[in-house]
Amino acid sequence: MKLTRVLIIAVLFLTAYQLTTVETYSRGKWMHRALRSTGKNPKVTRECSSPDESCTYHYNCCQLYCNKEENVCLENSPEV
């Protein structure tokens, strides 16, 4: 019975230690588990191009419309 209690307490301490080290090192070399797969920092804001500035993809533009033929951001969606 004592051995069971000791094992349960040891597992609880090891689990708590693992969770705190993941959180502690999330700002350094290690990242939080949710961010490990993407490798991105969600707090970083991305810059976008204003209308009439150059673009390569739609997500480069603030309005999310890129004329790929001319590589220019558009103010409104293109007419189809």
From Swiss-Prot:
The cysteines joined by S-S bonds are C48-C62, C55-C66, C61-C73
Propeptide stretches are: 25-47
Q: What is this protein called?
A: Conotoxin Lt6.2
**Any one GO molecular-function label of the UniProt entry:** ion channel inhibitor activity
Protein source organism: Conus litteratus
Q: What protein family does this chain belong to?
A: Belongs to the conotoxin O1 superfamily.
- Entry text on domains: The presence of a 'disulfide through disulfide knot' structurally defines this protein as a knottin.
Tell me the keywords, alphabetical order.
Disulfide bond, Knottin, Secreted, Signal, Toxin
One GO cellular component term, please give it.
extracellular region
Record lineage: Eukaryota, Metazoa, Spiralia, Lophotrochozoa, Mollusca
List the InterPro entries hit by this protein, alphabetically: Conotoxin (IPR004214)
Main localization, broad class = secreted
Organs and tissues of expression: Expressed by the venom duct.
- Localization per Swiss-Prot or TrEMBL: Secreted
